[in-house]
Amino acid sequence: MISVDSEQGISRDRLAELLNEDLAREYQSIIAYVVYSQVLKGAAYMSIADQLEIHAKQELDHALTISRQIDYLGKMPTVNPIPVKTSEDAKAMLRFDLENENETIR
């Protein structure tokens, strides 16, 4: 959560830093959704895999928006994602996805 002093506001550098943290999470999501959508196997997961492809594209749009904001602030967008957890187990992949989403919300 961003803490903003009502009188001082937030510095441009701090805002860019926080946006870069968000951008790193967007990259993480893109990579995870691309990988998970392709390696989930079985009829039970096909509709989920299709949705993950859609989410990957949405996350790319988010990453582009955040990158523009960082550039507007005169800073360089990060190129480093948060590490992506993978597994051979479909349920574990979906659990990782849920954990990532919960962490992003915090």
Language-model region placement:
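Iron-associated oxidoreductase/ferritin-like identity signal
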Residues: 1-106
